[in-house]
């Protein structure tokens, strides 16, 4: 699978996990498995991954009342991965990735 990581998930709870336990949270593709996520994090950030927990989040159902009646819809389902790193390792979300040298 080509890069299952979509974006870092930055919330108060995920920031607290990062500061206290060294765990980082990412939004990943819905069909990504733990092996793909581990490989992508290790390659992109150059760290050792100790463990990964994944959570399937269901999209919310939405309703809108209009003159023509009720319009029902649903937001997309998505997946979240909590990645635990080795001791003393960190990830800088805002650093630019290392540039690849051209051949």
From Swiss-Prot:
Annotated InterPro entries: Nucleotide-bd_a/b_plait_sf, Ribosomal_uL23-like, Ribosomal_uL23/eL15/eS24_sf
Gene Ontology biological-process entries: translation
Alphabetic keyword roster: Ribonucleoprotein, Ribosomal protein, RNA-binding, rRNA-binding
GO molecular function: rRNA binding; structural constituent of ribosome
GO CC entries: ribonucleoprotein complex; ribosome
Source species, domain of life: Bacteria
Transmembrane segments: none
Family the entry assigns: Belongs to the universal ribosomal protein uL23 family.
Function: One of the early assembly proteins it binds 23S rRNA. One of the proteins that surrounds the polypeptide exit tunnel on the outside of the ribosome. Forms the main docking site for trigger factor binding to the ribosome.
UniProt subunit comment: Part of the 50S ribosomal subunit. Contacts protein L29, and trigger factor when it is bound to the ribosome.
NCBIfam families from the UniProt entry: PRK05738.2-4
Protein name listed in UniProt: Large ribosomal subunit protein uL23
């Amino acid at each position: 699978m080509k890069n299952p990581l979509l974006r870092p998930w930055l919330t108060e709870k995920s920031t607290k996990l990062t500061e206290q336990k060294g765990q980082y949270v990412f939004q990943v593709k819905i069909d990504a498995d733990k092996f793909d996520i581990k490989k992508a994090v290790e390659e992109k950030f150059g760290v050792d991954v100790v463990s990964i927990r994944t959570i399937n989040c269901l999209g919310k159902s939405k309703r809108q009342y209009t003159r023509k009646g009720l319009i029902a819809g649903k937001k997309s389902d998505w997946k979240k991965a909590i990645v635990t790193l080795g001791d003393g390792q960190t990830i800088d979300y805002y650093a630019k990735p290392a540039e690849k040298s051209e051949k």
